[in-house]
Amino acid sequence: MTQFEKLDLLLRECGGTIQTFQVLNNGISKSVFYAYVKERGLEQASHGVYVSPDTWTDAMYLLHLRCGQAVFSHETALFFHDLTDREPLKYTITVRTGYNPSRLQEDGFQVYTVKKDLHEIGITTMLTSFGHSVPAYDMERTICDLLRSRKNIEMQVFQDALKQYAKRKDKNLRVLMKYAAMFHVEKILRPYLEVLL
């Protein structure tokens, strides 16, 4: 099997998206890989990420590959959890404080930052419409994030999401209140819950 055939197989196994580190881990040099990229007409989606020209582009998955610490949050997480019927105009992510989000913002993403110890709270895995796994915050964390960012969020979006959450059988009010205390939004959240529950 030639190295190009190995790369063809790897590209198929990875669903048409391949990263340079995967190539190197399979014992193929960068120079061979770059010749393959040119020969097969692969497009560079971001640094170290290449996509086959006949593959549908999964923007969410590419964003995840581009910025591994990014977690889909706010309106995008609402959409993942069916807590809104509005498809987000731009994807919203949260990264740790200290990460420079300027390039992501220039590319049209809404980026929030949070302290490192709060970044990992409530992370779950969701599937994009293309079937790729990406990190997103759970419903309870998303509601707390919306309250923390309420100056940047339409109040109607938050209220509709909370109404949808209250109807859900898989809601976890204990976790919601725990997160609300951690994120200092308990006093704001409680009156809404008293009306809905």
Roles of regions detected by a PLM:
Residues 26-38:
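Short amphipathic alpha-helical interaction segments
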Residues 1-16:
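Short amphipathic alpha-helical interface segments
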Residues 12, 25-26, 66:
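Charged, low-complexity surface patches
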Residues 40-46:
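A short, conserved structural fragment
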Residues 1, 19-21, 26:
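Conserved short "hinge" loops at termini or chain/domain junctions
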Residues 6, 17-22, 49-197:
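Nucleic-acid-binding surface
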